[in-house]
Swiss-Prot record:
This is Large ribosomal subunit protein uL1. GO terms for molecular function: rRNA binding; structural constituent of ribosome; tRNA binding. The keyword Membrane does not apply. The keyword Oxidoreductase does not apply. The gene is rplA. It comes from the Bacteria. The lineage of its organism: Bacteria, Bacillati, Chloroflexota, Dehalococcoidia, Dehalococcoidales. Gene3D superfamilies: 3.30.190.20, 3.40.50.790. It comes from Dehalococcoides mccartyi (strain ATCC BAA-2100 / JCM 16839 / KCTC 5957 / BAV1). Keywords: Repressor, Ribonucleoprotein, Ribosomal protein, RNA-binding, rRNA-binding, Translation regulation, tRNA-binding.
Amino acid sequence: MVTHGKKYQDAIKLLDQSAAYAPAEAIDLAKKMSAAKFDETVEMHLKMGLDPKNATQQLRGVAVLPHGLGKTVRVLVFAQGEAEKAAQVAGADVYGGDELIKKIEAGFLDFDVAISTPDMMSKVGKLGKVLGRRGLMPNPKSGTVVPAEDFKKVIEEARKGRVEFKLDRSGIVHIILGKASFEGQMLLENMTSVVDAIIRSKPTGAKGQYIKSAYLATTMGPGVRLDLRAVSAMGGV
């Protein structure tokens, strides 16, 4: 049985667990219930009406948060030759080809986003076990496998707050919206960007209710149930 400390128990007293809150109200409540000694992350969890085993119902995409994630993002680029020089000019924190791959195989993971040119992917693929489980593997569907001329745009997006989302095996999408220290309006605008991107990425094989439930929570706080109608309206549907 899971037990929670006094701070959690005090926080949950502020929450009506039978209610579904409007996004702005839920954000304010989640911020009030954030009682950890560190700046907690604010996350949204969406239960989708999708079958993770159905190839026509896969959900994966990218959202750019207008107010970022509240942290410095280190960007790595896999590239060689002229493309490696382009990565340097575009402002990548780490860049390289074969030697960089060896460095990662040896344990280097001091980066938050990985980008690759298409020609490097046959080599980068062998890092699947290392990068894949950490959500760092470059992927064309998430816009991180690009030609050198797109490096600047993708790197700038990553630094501004580019976040990837993907349906997990339980049919849930987990996505970070920012920090508990953010102003409520900043988190609301980040949430709007995320919901809009998820709705725009609706798979062709989706049937029935697309978003079945939505919750907001800080790292150590209780989940706040969101009003589905209000959430869906954020994406213009």
